[in-house]
């Protein structure tokens, strides 16, 4: 029996846009992602799948059914977000901003927020949506769930980001994270949500995987993410505005709440192809991970010609680690290259070049990377950690029981090394809308019938239930702490 500390959280994470729609009255047409996946040009060119989120699992209308199943599995924690476009479907009066902050890369040092301004915002909020979020959170709280309330999971109100115009090279409209106004608006939104729902939240996250937003949106057009405009310069602008937005949202939440505030980041574990590629690992980690966290923990920046910005320093109480697979790198003139055949660059339902099985998404089974990521964060920053997402696209549920046990084992291994890991939240409780890939990728412990909205337990849900009941990995499940046996091909 591999036991976890008393009070350790076992739960699940989910996204509003991916899970909420699917029942009458649940559609939210006012976000950039909603516009993006409905765009005919995107669908015809296969930038997106053509699946539509309004046909989703229906959490908005059936949340109690989801919570019932989570209770049966024995979960005690959840990360859930409030959709910005539901609360403020129309623009707020433009805030008073410092000179120059309508420009794409102007510094945002502070955002003036007080109760009078929050009450003014209250006049513009969609109180029907806010009341429904309160009902959802109250139901979770009444069942004893630890609630990590997240402010942002990739969607922006359409009045802040018109991705179709940006995709076409038209920057005269709302440009999202390319404009400092979004930094101000995000701080205001975060303060407002905390002001209205603080009695129900256990703690807060400002954002989930912001690095995917600036990366997939501007640097990796094959991902199919808005605005799908290839520009490394714009990617850097979006990154710095997001860094500022986190810091200003942290301050905004702290102005109305005493609860802890973290951020959740998309992580891979970098491995060298050969020993001489260790420098490539260091470069990849610095560019893709440490540059972001050094900004919001140490205040260190480089793009504005100064070493430290005090308004960014110490704006973090804990770190949320999302991990799915690794990345293998090698040295290159540009610093490093990622190699196909490993990590998330494999053939679907096949074998990686390391002879490890891959998922429905083509992601390599590699649990040791989670331990490595946790250890590196802990050694560098010493802040409490949560595993906030970890899961696998596996409709048949063949690999998921192995994936679940072997990754939770790596968390236990990190705990034994003295790493302060406070919870493991699986992605996800139920199948949902996988962004540009639509409904084809199924990550759920529960299988969703999208026509009837019924939920069916997969075997992995039973495995997770045994772990939560034991607060650890019981001996009878330890045989799953391994790479899944490779299934023979049928002739």
UniProtKB/Swiss-Prot annotation:
What is catalyzed by this enzyme?
A: Hydrolysis of terminal non-reducing beta-D-galactose residues in beta-D-galactosides
Query: Transport among the record's keywords?
Result: no
Q: List the disulfide bonds.
A: none
User: Which Pfam families would you find in this protein's record?
Assistant: Glyco_hydro_1 (PF00232)
What's the protein name? Beta-galactosidase
- Top EC class of this enzyme: hydrolase
Q: Does the keyword Hydrolase apply?
A: yes
Q: What is the lineage of its organism?
A: Archaea, Thermoproteota, Thermoprotei, Sulfolobales, Sulfolobaceae
Which residues are the active-site ones?
Answer: 209, 389
Per the UniProt entry, the Enzyme Commission number(s) are 3.2.1.23
Top-rank taxon: Archaea
Regarding protein family, the annotation reads:
Belongs to the glycosyl hydrolase 1 family.
Temperature annotation for this entry?
Thermostable.
Gene Ontology process terms (BP): carbohydrate metabolic process
Q: Give the originating organism.
A: Sulfolobus acidocaldarius (strain ATCC 33909 / DSM 639 / JCM 8929 / NBRC 15157 / NCIMB 11770)
This entry's Gene Ontology molecular function terms read: beta-galactosidase activity; beta-glucosidase activity
Annotated keywords: Glycosidase, Hydrolase
Write down the NCBIfam families for this protein, in alphabetical order. Beta_gal_BgaS (NF041004)
